[in-house]
Design a protein with these regions (language model features):
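Glycine-rich phosphate-binding loops of nucleotide-dependent enzymes
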Residues: 1-209
Length: 209
């Protein structure tokens, strides 16, 4: 069943790690605008399924997978995170993907920096353009404000509470302009203990987003 009513369809997904079956014919259909939760005990294969959806290297370096993935009605092969991001898929991982010595803005805008021309640009072209920190700060602050996070984007990530780091990961995905599907691999596990009220408010905000 290939239907553009569905943003993602995963059919008969199978995955083994070194001969050990992890996924055995999993099907997942998500309509546009829906919110789904995958429930299961540790080792059930939830993260593996999400890694397949986001094209993580660990999947393809261990023999790939079997089955079909359809995104917005089109059969596709998501062979890398870049492919996933180009389709409009974002993912917040269990493990932090932030650079501690960078500011919040630098982490949110990493590999998506905004450039502006300067006096050398007409002669040297795009390679002479400089980073537009003002615009990047403004856009990053909007993402933080959307989550109700009271932080300044110029702050360094290093030393922030664990819960804040997870919010920054979420803000990074929200900031992507072509975002069509957002995947969370247990991102609130560390936040529930440390920041229950903020976590609940953020989840409500994301459900409206």
């Amino acid at each position: 069943m290939q239907n553009q009513e569905y943003i993602i369809q995963m059919k008969d997904i199978r995955k083994e790690y070194f001969g050990n079956p992890v996924l055995k014919g999993v099907n997942l259909n998500v309509k546009k605008g829906e919110i789904h939760a995958l429930l299961g005990e540790n080792g059930a294969g939830k993260s593996t399924l999400m890694n397949i959806l986001f094209g993580m290297p660990v999947i393809h370096s261990t023999g790939g997978y079997q089955g079909e993935v359809t995104f917005d009605g089109q059969l596709t092969t998501i062979d890398s995170p870049n492919t996933a991001m180009n389709l409009g898929i974002g993912m917040v991982h269990q493990e932090f993907m932030l650079i501690p010595g960078f500011s919040i803005t630098e982490n949110i805008k990493l590999n998506r920096e905004i450039l502006k021309p300067n006096i050398f640009s007409p002669m040297l072209g795009d390679q002479a353009k400089t980073l537009d920190f003002k615009k990047m700060d403004q856009e990053s602050q909007v993402s933080l404000d959307t989550l109700g996070l009271n932080l300044k984007v110029q702050s360094k990530v290093e030393g922030l509470p664990v819960g804040f780091m997870q919010f920054i990961e979420i803000a990074r995905e929200i900031d992507k302009k072509n975002m069509r599907l957002m995947v969370f691999d247990e991102p609130i596990a560390v936040m529930i203990e440390r920041q229950p009220r903020s976590t609940l408010n953020a989840k409500r905000t994301l459900f409206r987003f």
